A protein has these predicted regions:
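Short beta-strand elements in bilobed, periplasmic/extracellular small-molecule ligand-binding domains
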Residues: 29-44, 138-141, 162-181
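Hydrophobic alpha-helical
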Residues: 62, 68-88, 169, 173-244
Length: 299
């Protein structure tokens, strides 16, 4: 079979996406693929333009497949339709969109999704909050951009699973530690922040949790520093990123997620080899670290 050419479009280069990019390249090398990774700097217009340029290139220059994690929850429907019409396979990674089933009616190319269960990840974080705050309290949530599918789904899951006697305040950030540090620092300067009332901080990734923690610990007040050192911080990420933070007591607990890229690439290659559509949607695993039962003993 001719060497497959695959382009991977990632929204940014945060810790999770960096790992996705590394896995794309190493898996591509192992399987003998022509693999290219591009990034959109969290800009949906940039991502759309990058992909359309590839789709509209000459037939000789076009890839066999695009593996895409959309920047926003809208999910690049028109771009996906253009790709499939041009005979390019379309794979959604780490997100869910509402048009995959429709596109799969065209048997020309593989179309499928490999994703984290973002809603379930949020539910796990909500259960961690419940384990740590059985009497209720106030939680500072440091979350990704409003238009991000990941941010929306994780928030909804967390909100459903957390106890009703837990109140949340949300800070918005880009998907980086530095952005979370800046957002939290700016919020602390507001007269209405009332930082002292919060009994837990939950980040939608471990980077957001760590960035917020650094900002909160930068206070000049010894009493406030002591408070934040004793406050539970929660994060989300792959095992190699979050377990050392929990073991090092930077985070109290984390939701451990999995990368999607390896499964997406291997599934795609098999689809080309067998000329058959893969399952429409595959979900990778997530779990609490430590286990929820053990976490309840930490309160």
């Amino acid at each position: 079979m001719k060497k497959l050419r695959i382009v991977v479009s990632l929204p940014n280069d945060n810790a999770y996406q960096h790992e996705q990019g590394v896995i794309a390249k190493t898996t591509g090398e192992r399987l003998g693929l022509d693999m290219q990774v591009i990034r959109a700097d969290d800009d949906s217009i940039t991502q759309s333009q990058q992909l359309l340029k590839i789709i509209q290139s000459s037939a000789e220059a076009r890839p066999n497949a695009l593996i895409v994690e959309p920047v926003t929850a809208t999910g690049l429907r028109r771009v996906a339709e253009a790709a499939v019409a041009a005979g390019i396979a379309w794979v959604i990674s780490n997100s869910d969109v509402d048009y995959v089933q429709q596109l799969r009616k065209s048997p020309r190319v593989p179309v499928f999704t490999v994703t984290q269960g973002q809603h379930e990840i949020g539910r796990l974080q909500g259960k961690q909050i419940a384990a740590l705050l059985p009497q209720g309290g106030a939680v500072l949530c440091v979350e990704g951009p409003t238009m991000s599918f990941v941010a929306v789904q994780r928030h909804e899951g967390m909100d459903i699973a957390k106890p009703r006697n837990v109140q949340t305040t949300t800070l918005r950030s880009k998907w980086s530690e530095e952005s979370a540090f800046q957002s939290t620092g700016a919020w602390l300067k507001l007269a209405t922040s009332r930082a002292e009332k919060f009994s837990l901080v939950a980040g939608q990734t471990h980077e957001l949790a760590v960035g917020a923690r650094k900002a909160l610990l930068s206070t000049e007040s010894p009493e406030q520093q002591k408070k934040w050192l004793e406050t539970p911080f929660l994060g989300i990420g792959i095992a190699s990123q979050v377990k050392p933070l929990v073991n090092g007591r930077i985070l109290t607990a984390a939701v451990v997620t999995s990368v999607t890229m390896d499964i997406a690439i291997r599934t795609l290659v098999k689809a080309f080899e067998t000329q058959a559509q893969p399952p429409e949607r595959t979900v990778v695993e997530a779990s609490s670290f430590p286990d929820l039962d053990k976490l309840a003993t930490k309160r």
